[in-house]
């Protein structure tokens, strides 16, 4: 690879970089070798200041360059224990991100359209998150994104929150009244 490996995270990134093209049937079908190498170099440079969850998202970004729906980096129990999430889940239904699970106190928002997270429109959130989720099409992107869209760690990694512990502001259009609530 030509880059010096000086810590365990760099060793893992290098392993992924070397093995993905060997183990994937056609890794470079939609990504050039130059693009993959550039992403690898960027990941290697960032490891010094990277926590475990940022490292996880960095590995996801590298693996997603396969640009298919079956190549990904999974979560370990140790990582799951470090995740922070808001008490809601979202699904892409009827052409919009909607609240699919929420606490009883906010049941009136169930099925409501999520307009923005921390004032960032959902279309922009989706665009920012897209490089972290290997996918062949928008259906797969939205499916995989829905599994992590309630994670404040994801918001922090994408830059739509300053930290995972930051209070999250959701803008939701209530389904029954069309009123927007933040």
Predicted regions and their residues:
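Flexible, low-complexity junctional segments that flank or bridge functional domains
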Residues: 1-182
């Amino acid at each position: 690879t030509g880059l010096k490996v000086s810590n365990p995270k760099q060793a893992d990134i290098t392993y992924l970089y070397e093995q993905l093209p060997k183990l994937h049937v056609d890794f470079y079908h939609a990504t050039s070798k130059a693009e993959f190498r550039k992403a690898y170099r960027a990941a290697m440079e960032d490891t010094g200041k990277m926590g475990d969850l940022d490292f996880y998202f960095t590995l996801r970004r590298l693996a997603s360059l396969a640009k298919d729906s079956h190549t990904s980096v999974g979560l370990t129990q140790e990582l799951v224990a470090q995740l922070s999430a808001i008490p809601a889940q979202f699904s892409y239904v009827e052409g919009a991100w909607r609240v699919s699970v929420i606490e009883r106190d906010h049941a009136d928002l169930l099925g409501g359209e999520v307009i923005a997270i921390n004032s960032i429109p959902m279309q922009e959130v989706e665009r920012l998150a897209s490089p972290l989720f290997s996918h062949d099409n928008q259906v797969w992107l939205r499916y995989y994104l829905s599994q992590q869209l309630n994670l404040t760690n994801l918001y922090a990694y994408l830059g739509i929150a300053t930290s995972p512990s930051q209070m999250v502001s959701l803008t939701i259009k209530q389904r029954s009244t069309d009123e927007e609530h933040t």
